[in-house]
Design a protein with these regions (language model features):
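Extended, structured polyanion-binding interfaces
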Residues: 1-321
Length: 321
């Protein structure tokens, strides 16, 4: 895993800093999954189908990213499996210098963090129908869960160090997108108003009505064209911060999940070190992914590692200050 991280960093040295960070998560309600289920089955009963459909859609997405958002120089992607079961892909894309986001308008064309306004009721044009469909997809897939209030400590996104959401939700309202600088991330436009407000279902333990009102503060950045095509959670972030490069790639290559297991013996043996072992665990989705021999990740270019040691001798590394 560390060697793959170094390969990715070598691509950055050669081609330049990343331009886009894309995350795609499988949708168990994809029509390809639903029509393959038996009458008494649910998606969680057929992770083999979910893995196959996700792999096919991921290949299509990787092709689209070669030119849909700008001319691509290089990319790297890694497949990860959530503890809740659904596979997702993290993709870092390096675009040409001419296609990199340089201003607010360019960032808005690549990624937005707003709920699409609802067209007029009497407007039945194709554009209005697409707008309605996009709004429904954003509310279904691109709205962050409600992690505010005291109940937020029980949410998956809670960060004890921040005493709040690890993704910094909810964001402040912002009238215009700002590009940021080398130390500050770009801020997406998140306007305030009734046009960008909607009601979505939520956990009844947080609301007696089973609904919550969401604004642009809770929207995960997305690309409209990609969301309409793939109908799943598809986060598209524009990377403008130079110091975030190593963070992105270390996040990609952080490795698989592990679990600590305690071993209890019938006879009393005072060996506390051996009583605890660290094991990898595989969920159903990851197991099928490996059975089908799907790729766990790939770099668009081949990196040749040069040997820096004498033949038949151990390689040595040295940290440069």
């Amino acid at each position: 895993m560390y060697a793959r991280y170094l390969d990715a960093m070598a691509a950055v040295v050669h081609f330049g800093a990343p331009s886009l960070f894309v995350t795609m998560t499988a949708n168990p309600n994809w029509k390809e999954v639903q029509r393959s289920l038996a009458y008494d089955q649910t998606p969680k009963d057929r992770y083999d189908i979910i893995s196959r459909v996700f792999n096919a859609k991921l290949k299509e997405l990787l092709k689209d990213l070669e030119g849909m958002l700008g001319k691509q120089l290089a990319k790297v992607h890694v497949i990860e499996f959530q503890k809740r079961g659904l596979p997702h892909a993290h993709i870092v894309v390096i675009l040409t210098e001419a296609d990199r986001a340089r201003n607010a308008n360019h960032i808005n064309s690549l990624s937005t963090a707003e709920i699409p306004p609802l067209p007029d009721v009497n407007d039945r044009s194709n554009l209005a129908n697409v707008q309605r469909r996009l709004r429904a997809l954003v509310l279904e897939h691109m709205v962050h869960n409600d992690c505010s209030g005291p109940e937020g400590r029980n949410c998956r996104c809670y960060d004890a160090n921040k005493d709040g959401c690890s993704g910094n939700f909810p964001f402040d309202f912002c009238e215009e997108t700002t590009t940021g600088d080398e130390r500050q991330k770009a801020r997406y436009r998140r306007r305030r108003g009734a046009s960008w407000t909607a009601t979505v279902p939520c956990d009844r333990r947080k609301s007696a009505t089973g609904t919550r009102v969401v604004t642009n503060q809770w929207v995960v950045p997305y690309n409209a064209a990609l969301l309409l095509k793939y109908t799943c959670h598809l986060n598209v972030e524009v990377v403008t911060v130079a110091y975030a490069i190593k963070y992105l790639f270390k996040y990609l290559f952080k490795g698989s999940d592990n679990a600590s297991a305690a071993i209890h013996q019938t006879q009393r043996i005072l060996d506390q070190i051996s009583n605890y072992e660290n094991h990898r665990y595989l969920g159903a989705a990851e197991s099928f992914w490996r059975i089908f021999k799907f790729s766990p990740g790939q770099l668009s270019h081949t990196v040749v590692r040069m040997a820096v040691c004498f033949p038949d001798e151990r390689c040595a590394t040295r940290t440069l200050c």
